[in-house]
């Protein structure tokens, strides 16, 4: 275990909410910097755009608890809760920044407890993203992390060491996501314009998404839908693409990967390359699309335009099966607007039950929307701000029951906020 220490800048206390530290309002290239806006901050007109203002809600949804500062002093780009743990198990999350992945527990009484810190052997590594799974044989928690060097590390948290490394992407990896049901399947999106699907149990690359009609620039964000049979991706080319996994060919490859053994086979695994997405559009955003997640059959995505857009591929009445690869039309359902977030690689958080979204900005503020899946336009928004939170908020994560919200910042700080009402979401 690394000897890294974290500086606790503020111990949790029982002071009144009205103290001055907390306020609530209701209302590609290799030189590209993750702290610069890629274009003018002026928002452009979207095709089919609907103007929508979130409804203000009386009272902030979350209350400040504590924050710590990691001693590497560098940007923390990623944060992820281990939502695979049970309701009565500890609330654990990991951060990704510098060449380290740091694991914390959120005690029920408040505060943050440092559990582990993994330091990559390469001091030049910068982790951008991390994601949780577990060993199917031992049930030990596993943390996958990747970043600048383009190498995926799979870390055994209990042993605090990398047990597997995956090399295939030619450049940096911007995001990792595990399959929601088959937790040995890992998805990675890279600066090399490609997306890869891995089986970390048998150590093979099942599929590569990209090529002829793939992304034309860095892949910045990826996500599985809740059934795990579709992928959405977004990138610097301003495009959003859908890729289907429910075809006979893909299902066969996934099944084959479960039993494949490199030691027993004289041939490498027959990786499939998918050159053509099942849907693609550039009509939603006019800038880098740096975060995308599924919201039921809808998609949530954001760019450097001060709005998260909720949209659906094709017409509102169309099913996915009715979409054609040549069709780029889409329907915008709602927009969730915010202020002062015009740089790229700032990612929103969505709780596992898809009821709360949160996004930070360049001033250290966090916007929280409470969602109604049957009426996305009816979302209620509140703003969280602590006067000591002044750096760009890079990513937000929720605990399994959304009782804890955690975010990470460019000044190496990690912030914990607790839901005001005891009832879980």
Swiss-Prot record:
UniProt biased composition (Acidic residues): 11-20
GO CC aspect terms: chromatin; ESC/E(Z) complex; nucleus; polytene chromosome
Broad class of where this protein is predominantly found: nucleus
Keywords from the named record: Developmental protein, Nucleus, Phosphoprotein, Repeat, Repressor, Transcription, Transcription regulation, WD repeat
Basic and acidic residues biased stretches: 1-10
Cell compartment(s), UniProt: Nucleus
WD repeat residue intervals: 71-116, 126-165, 168-208, 214-253, 284-321, 340-379, 388-424
SMART domains linked to this entry: WD40
Post-translational modification: Phosphorylated.
UniProt KW Transcription keyword: yes
InterPro entries for the chain: PcG_WD-repeat (IPR051243), WD40/YVTN_repeat-like_dom_sf (IPR015943), WD40_repeat_CS (IPR019775), WD40_repeat_dom_sf (IPR036322), WD40_rpt (IPR001680)
Pfam name, any one: WD40
Source taxon at top rank: Eukaryota
Keyword flag Repressor: yes
GO biological process: anterior/posterior axis specification; facultative heterochromatin formation; regulation of transcription by RNA polymerase II; transcription initiation-coupled chromatin remodeling
Functional description taken from the UniProt entry: Polycomb group (PcG) protein. In contrast to other PcG protein, it is specifically required during the first 6 hours of embryogenesis to establish PcG silencing. PcG proteins act by forming multiprotein complexes, which are required to maintain the transcriptionally repressive state of homeotic genes throughout development. PcG proteins are not required to initiate repression, but to maintain it during later stages of development. They probably act via a methylation of histones, rendering chromatin heritably changed in its expressibility.
Family: Belongs to the WD repeat ESC family.
Assembly and binders: Component of the Esc/E(z) complex, composed of Esc, E(z), Su(z)12, HDAC1/Rpd3, Caf1 and probably Pho. This complex is distinct from the PRC1 complex, which contains many other PcG proteins like Pc, Ph, Psc, Su(z)2. The two complexes however cooperate and interact together during the first 3 hours of development to establish PcG silencing.
PANTHER family associated with the record: POLYCOMB PROTEIN
Protein name: Polycomb protein esc
Organism (species): Drosophila virilis (Fruit fly)
